[in-house]
Amino acid sequence: LATGVSTLAKLLNPKIKVIGVEPAGANCMQESFKNGKVTTLPSVNTIADGTAVKTPGSNIFPYIKKNLDDIITVEDDELIVAFLDMVENHKMIVENSGLLTVAALKHLGVKDKRVVSILSGGNMDVITMSSVVQQGLIFRDRIFTVSVLLPDKPGELAKVAQTLADVQGNVIKLEHN
């Protein structure tokens, strides 16, 4: 995607700035860009499975080297937050690799500038989606896991429930043993 977009963008406007984005746990293109040659990573670790590659394509690397002005990385946590934002605020499902550009925006200092952020792909299974939403809610302090040791007598759990209700809290799941 970066090869085609950057090549076309530079053909249309040679002065345009094109920045590539990779997951921090799979930054083979960034390393290759820095080294000036195709570089293989020892391993990759990212939730962005569509971009989780150890070695960039040798055929596309010359175009990337020529047409990208920079390559930055984003952490998986930033992808999780971007996914939650897209679902809640824009009602869009975009796979983790397709959200790299959205997650990168906060690193670029582009306020009051014209920016195009390309979103691609919606290939995400529901189990992964559920996990990403859950993690996003945790990162935003919207859900918590709490363990409480209560005396074994009537009314104790009701007191905890009332305390939560007093602060507009809700119980999603309760385990008792």
What kind of feature is each model-predicted range?
Residues 1-6, 26-30, 97-105, 118, ...:
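Short glycine/serine/threonine-rich phosphate/pyrophosphate-binding segments
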Residues 9, 13-17, 22-79, 91:
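Small/polar-residue-rich loop-to-helix segments that shape phosphate-bearing ligand pockets
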Residues 15-17, 114, 170:
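Residues at the starts of beta-strands that form the adenosine-phosphate
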Residues 57-113, 172:
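Active-site-adjacent helical/loop segments in soluble small-molecule enzymes
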